[in-house]
Amino acid sequence: MTPRSRITSRPWTSASVPAIDRQTLFTPEFLAQLERLSLASRRVFRGRVKGERRSLRRGHSVEFCDYRPYGIGDDLRYVDWNVYGRLDRLHVKLFLDEEDLCLHLVIDASASMDFGSPTKLDYAVRLAAALGFVGFVNLERVGVGVVRERLSEGWAPARGRSQFGPMVDFLSAIKSEGATRLNEGLAAYALRSREPGLAVIMSDLLDPNGFESGVRSFLERRFDVHLIHLLDPEEMNPDFAGDLRLVDSETGELRELSVDGDAVREYRDRLRQFLERVESFCRAHEIGYHRVITDTPVEEFVLSQLKGLVLA
């Protein structure tokens, strides 16, 4: 028995993914709280267009910050000659410049994400909408990628509050279907992205071939990576027993077995080992790891667990 297996009597289908109404997606109170937040990145990214993100750079801007010794290759226009006259040493002016950040929202939409109420995909979509809203109100660029057996769909990075509605429309049309090949899909998105940024990957990570090499593709391109691991309450604590017929939701493989206390204990032990493996990988590669059970309200998860990590 694996977390990806389903009991055939349960009517989980892609049609169960509810359409998302942009007018009722979030309460005005939650949106007001999101407006006071910004994206938090552990790396500095040089963008094409200035946003509202402040970073320390040498060169021209609106606010002087500090000096540092001149280095080979520095632009002589930013040498402070008055300091040179006093100290007989070359120093370059530093300014607070504006940093442009691109938020990459990467969603696993394979068939295993169509489980639970809400489904894991529905939860990921609402979460992506919340993070995207924060990006838009801060004039950051926000893009979306959808992975299944490969990189299936995408919404090109865009900027501005007016883009929130179109992004929600795109998100609401995503359907969970097909097998999972996370490594291939994630690698394809990382390689196609023109420039790195803050990547938030949302998945249940239920791929027998793993996910690690796909995530490494983002690290190799110098993305700041956060992994949001979605699990349904029933996957954490299965409550079924007896003679069952299980069907793999992605491959269609059928397995009949009797579930007793020993089988449930074995399942929980394997799940624990799986979660420890994921956490260990993320810790070793300095990836932000955030596990969420989908009965946790999206608003609570965003404001209590992501604030101070993905959001500031």
Locations of the language-model features?
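Von Willebrand factor type A / integrin I
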Residues: T2-L56, L191-G197, D207-N209, S213-A312
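Short, electropositive alpha-helical surface patch
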Residues: W155-D169, G261, K307-G308
